[in-house]
Amino acid sequence: MADQQLGVLKALDVAKTQLYHFTAIVIAGMGFFTDAYDLFCVSLVTKLLGRLYYFNPTSAKPGSLPPHVAAAVNGVALCGTLAGQLFFGWLGDKLGRKKVYGITLIMMILCSVASGLSLGNSAKGVMTTLCFFRFWLGFGIGGDYPLSATIMSEYANKKTRGAFIAAVFAMQGVGILAGGFVALAVSSIFDKKFPSPTYEQDRFLSTPPQADYIWRIIVMFGALPAALTYYWRMKMPETARYTALVAKNIKQATADMSKVLQTDLELEERVEDDVKDPKKNYGLFSKEFLRRHGLHLLGTTSTWFLLDIAFYSQNLFQKDIFSAIGWIPKAATMNAIHEVFKIARAQTLIALCSTVPGYWFTVAFIDIIGRFAIQLMGFFMMTVFMFAIAFPYNHWILPDNRIGFVVMYSLTFFFANFGPNATTFIVPAEIFPARLRSTCHGISAATGKAGAIVGAFGFLYAAQPQDKTKTDAGYPPGIGVKNSLIMLGVINFVGMLFTFLVPEPKGKSLEELSGEAEVDK
């Protein structure tokens, strides 16, 4: 029963919202700011990379990345993230959250800078070094998912735990926004300093050599917020739940949380034996785990997988959709710097109007209406809006209807973030036992990233027109944007069905949810 919960953990559960909660949100949230900035900023500069390194003076179109290179540049960080989520999720349960937390941040800082310094005498050399460092950048980013979620859930009180974890995740939206603003600022400065003709006017001069610095500056900027929070990450004590329930050191947990809560907590020697009860030490691959949490893990992994197919395929390739409906002019009518500016402006507008508000709506309502309701509603609304865009797609691409298209498209993003994009991150940090919490969150997140890889790689090919003569250079014919959007709508609907496997953690302590507060079974 819940009354068997340790006093130190009960104190955390009923603690009033105070400064240390907000400090933890900022420290963990800045990691997510960097995560989102790094993962999405590359979508702002892929067109520029094509112009710089794959320029063909005989072509009527500016240079573009060959399909395999575009897939690698867009997807390699996602592959690294998947590996990092599994590895650091497991390590966070083995060594402790705090010990591993600094390593992920150092990796992010070093690899962000190294990505921007990618060198080589040829296009192949630059792309190879860029992909190498982006893989390891993703590896560090991957570690931040299970660790940030677990740390925040273990520090929070049960009344506002959902909002605190959601606030950490909402920093992703700010990171995406920052990526857009940095790209806008950098491209504007370079445009004033190095004015250039359009590609149609002069194929050679439309991409000034100085444009090579633009993508490097944008990519490297991601290291700055991570570097600023490193000191504070190292100052955080280990979470009481890890120290007491996994490391079995209730004395240390009580001392740590007395400092954090700024109050004297009584040490409970009588429950030391209960914490060491072998009945509560079942492993991840045991029958007991399968009985208690098997369906929960299936629910968290499947919903995250399906959500990320839709979310990442849209997000990474927004610029292609905007080009298709004419929101971004034809590449040949712009120079390289203007193209970066126009893509950044379009993505920033979408983020400002839909992505960021969606995250903060989740923060506001998650502890009122619950995780289950938000996730179910989000998947349902994403399905509705995706079909509303897809079936009359030929109507939306008419010039008079473009604003309507962008509104509908923005609403799918709003309900992704005021919906499953936030809840799939929050719930796995709440419903599993402390000794497996980080691992299970890592498994759930990695399955999500597998979906992101399917979306990122698959959408590149699927969205190509069915007419061979209209495909991008090097791509085979696909099923077209309309059919791709219908597929994404179906995926969202299936995600809604799998949501019924996920329990509702609202208002319950972590020990109640995981079964760690039960003495006899």
UniProtKB/Swiss-Prot annotation:
CDD domains in the record: MFS_PhT
Segments in the Cytoplasmic topological domain: 1-24, 92-99, 153-161, 233-292, 370-371, 424-441, 506-521
SUPFAM superfamilies, alphabetized: MFS general substrate transporter
Main location: membrane
PROSITE patterns for this protein: MFS
Protein topology in the membrane: Multi-pass membrane protein
Keywords: Membrane, Phosphate transport, Symport, Transmembrane, Transmembrane helix, Transport
Induction info: In roots by phosphate starvation.
Example of a GO MF term: phosphate transmembrane transporter activity
Segments on the Extracellular face: 46-70, 121-131, 183-211, 314-348, 393-402, 463-484
Tissue: Mainly expressed in roots, especially in the stele of the primary root, the pericycle and trichoblasts of secondary roots. To a lower extent, present in hydathodes and vascular tissues of young leaves.
GO cellular component entries: plasma membrane
Pfam families found in the cross-reference section: Sugar_tr
GO biological process: phosphate ion transport
Additional note from the record: Although related to the sugar transporter family, it does not transport sugars.
Function, as annotated: High-affinity transporter for external inorganic phosphate.
Family: Belongs to the major facilitator superfamily. Phosphate:H(+) symporter (TC 2.A.1.9) family.
Protein name in UniProt: Probable inorganic phosphate transporter 1-3
Organism: Arabidopsis thaliana
Source taxonomy: Eukaryota, Viridiplantae, Streptophyta, Embryophyta, Tracheophyta
The gene coding this protein: PHT1-3
